From Swiss-Prot:
Similarity remark: Belongs to the universal ribosomal protein uL5 family.
Keywords: Ribonucleoprotein, Ribosomal protein, RNA-binding, rRNA-binding, tRNA-binding
Naturally occurring in which organism (per UniProt): Thermus thermophilus (strain ATCC 27634 / DSM 579 / HB8)
Record keyword Transmembrane present: no
Gene3D superfamilies: 3.30.1440.10
PROSITE patterns: RIBOSOMAL_L5
Reported function: This is one of the proteins that bind and probably mediate the attachment of the 5S RNA into the large ribosomal subunit, where it forms part of the central protuberance. In the 70S ribosome it contacts protein S13 of the 30S subunit (forming bridge B1b) connecting the head of the 30S subunit to the top of the 50S subunit. The bridge itself contacts the P site tRNA and is implicated in movement during ribosome translocation.
GO cellular component: ribonucleoprotein complex; ribosome
UniProt xrefs under InterPro entries: Ribosomal_uL5 (IPR002132), Ribosomal_uL5_bac-type (IPR020930), Ribosomal_uL5_C (IPR031309), Ribosomal_uL5_CS (IPR020929), Ribosomal_uL5_dom_sf (IPR022803), Ribosomal_uL5_N (IPR031310)
Protein name in the entry: Large ribosomal subunit protein uL5
Subunit structure: Part of the 50S ribosomal subunit; part of the 5S rRNA/uL5/uL18/bL25 (TL7) subcomplex; has also been isolated as a complex with 5S rRNA, bL25 (TL7) and DNA binding protein II. Forms a bridge to the 30S subunit in the 70S ribosome, contacting protein uS13; this bridge is straddled by the 5S rRNA. Contacts the P site tRNA.
Gene Ontology MF, one: tRNA binding
Length: 182
């Protein structure tokens, strides 16, 4: 039995009908929907100390509810003292209910906890209907307490939609409650 996530229900009951009305889709499968959310954490300092990677993976797993995959260096770069295959980051891909739960938490709890938050940058769409945002610290999530944190680590969040254009994607995310800057 799938979970009843409020944001998911909002999409099916309010957002989808509004998008059909606004853009005049002929078929419900044409309506843009969320495909996945990819969270990436670059940890350059992890090449010196493996414990940093473990701690960051623990925190990311708490935030997302899913074990992160370790990303490794594609090639060696001597200026960065980097060898091919060294662990340099973490990545989590959320789909279905986990994605909806994470987004609900991001929109309702995490973003409002950011100091001096004035809204998300409306220009961070990639031209293909996907939205990217960066967070400076992991403390804004309720699962992470101040005592657990050894260092502030940011993360990149990519919201992948089936929208063909940025205009459609922006309408979808705005209706879902993403707080864009005016």
């Amino acid at each position: 039995m799938p979970l009843d996530v409020a944001l998911k229900r909002k999409y099916y009951e309010e957002v989808r009908p509004e998008l059909i009305r606004r853009f005049g889709y002929q078929n419900v499968w044409e309506v843009p929907r969320l495909e996945k959310v990819v969270i990436n954490q670059g940890l350059g300092e992890a090449k010196e100390d493996a414990r940093i990677l473990e701690k960051a993976a623990q925190e990311l797993a708490l935030i997302t509810g899913q074990k992160p995959a370790v990303t490794r260096a594609k090639k060696s770069i001597s200026n960065f003292k980097l060898r091919k295959g060294m662990p340099i980051g973490l990545r989590v891909t959320l789909r279905r209910d986990r994605m909806w739960i994470f987004l609900e938490k991001l929109l309702n709890v995490a973003l409002p906890r950011i100091r001096d938050f004035r809204g998300l940058n409306p220009n961070s769409f990639d031209g293909r209907g996907n939205y990217n945002l960066g967070l400076r610290e992991q403390l804004i999530f309720p699962e992470i307490t101040y005592d657990m944190v050894d260092a502030l680590r940011g993360m990149d969040i990519a919201v992948v939609t089936t929208a063909e254009t940025d205009e459609e994607a922006r309408a979808l995310l705005e209706l879902l409650g993403f707080p864009f800057r005016k």
